Amino acid sequence: MKQYLELIQKVLDEGTQKNDRTGTGTLSIFGHQMRFNLLEGFPLVTTKRCHLRSIIHELLWFLQGDTNIAYLHENNVTIWDEWADENGDLGPVYGKQWRAWPTPDGRHIDQIATVLSQLKNDPDSRRIIVSAWNVGELDKMALAPCHAFFQFYVADGKLSCQLYQRSCDVFLGLPFNIASYALLVHMMAQQCDLDVGDFVWTGGDTHLYSNHMEQTHLQLSREPRALPKLVIKRKPDSLFDYRFDDFEIEGYDPHPGIKAPVAI
């Protein structure tokens, strides 16, 4: 994950001090890209321990179209708690947009099912895209989508994906986002009988919060370790039938975790 540490250093060296919605303050750059060859290992940050349970369960939750944190709580995942209302609802966030984007005539579009069909039946299409940025429903969401738009690409029997992330918390959020989308590419590839290719991450407002600086410097002082390997133990009947126990990360030997406050 050398690219990730290089990004941290770039933000520290070149970032502009900016105010933000949370009132915390950031160092920010605009426009950055990283590419991860998924055949070379699973891109999980090793300079601090990442909470795999949260990463996997959150993705499974998205794929079910769920927008209430009850499922997450049942599985000891609390990463969405700060934004949920008293009933655990988040409004029409990622899961709703991925699986049931509303149309003006009252129908709903399952973008994930559509993408799966395209990958199987028209893999050379340049329209294999999922968007969570529904302008008509942004004001109903507890949090506007940060990872907003992603596109799949098939070449030489390999599946690649590029994500555009309009806002990126480099220290806390980005390691989760990279691992989550890498996991999704592996799952999609298995369902479509493809190998994995590259995951390309593109960031818009890419920032370090002012109250993450001590943690950031600690992380930069650590030497990256070898990337782990993702093992998917079975091939379910559909993308929507994966379970937490289907995934195993082999050889993950990270440095200790580093706690930092979440900007809300």
Curated annotation (Swiss-Prot):
Main location: cytoplasm
One of the Pfam families matching this protein, by short name: Thymidylat_synt
CDD domains: TS_Pyrimidine_HMase (cd00351)
Keyword annotations: Cytoplasm, Methyltransferase, Nucleotide biosynthesis, Transferase
EC top class named in words: transferase
The reaction(s) this protein catalyses: dUMP + (6R)-5,10-methylene-5,6,7,8-tetrahydrofolate = 7,8-dihydrofolate + dTMP
Positions with a binding annotation for (6R)-5,10-methylene-5,6,7,8-tetrahydrofolate: 51, 169, 263
Binding-site residues, dUMP: 21, 126-127, 166-169, 177, 207-209
GO molecular function: thymidylate synthase activity
EC number: 2.1.1.45
Annotated InterPro entries: Thymidate_synth/dCMP_Mease, Thymidate_synth/dCMP_Mease_dom, Thymidate_synth/dCMP_Mease_sf, Thymidylate_synthase, Thymidylate_synthase_AS
Gene3D superfamilies: Thymidylate synthase/dCMP hydroxymethylase domain (3.30.572.10)
Pathway membership, UniProt: Pyrimidine metabolism; dTTP biosynthesis
GO biological process, one term: methylation
Active-site residues from the entry: 146 (nucleophile)
Domain of life: Bacteria
GO cellular component: cytosol
Intracellular or extracellular location(s): Cytoplasm
Family to which this protein belongs: Belongs to the thymidylate synthase family. Bacterial-type ThyA subfamily.
General function of this protein: Catalyzes the reductive methylation of 2'-deoxyuridine-5'-monophosphate (dUMP) to 2'-deoxythymidine-5'-monophosphate (dTMP) while utilizing 5,10-methylenetetrahydrofolate (mTHF) as the methyl donor and reductant in the reaction, yielding dihydrofolate (DHF) as a by-product. This enzymatic reaction provides an intracellular de novo source of dTMP, an essential precursor for DNA biosynthesis.
Oligomeric form and interacting partners: Homodimer.
Protein name: Thymidylate synthase
Organism (species): Salmonella typhi
Lineage: Bacteria, Pseudomonadati, Pseudomonadota, Gammaproteobacteria, Enterobacterales
Gene designation per UniProt: thyA
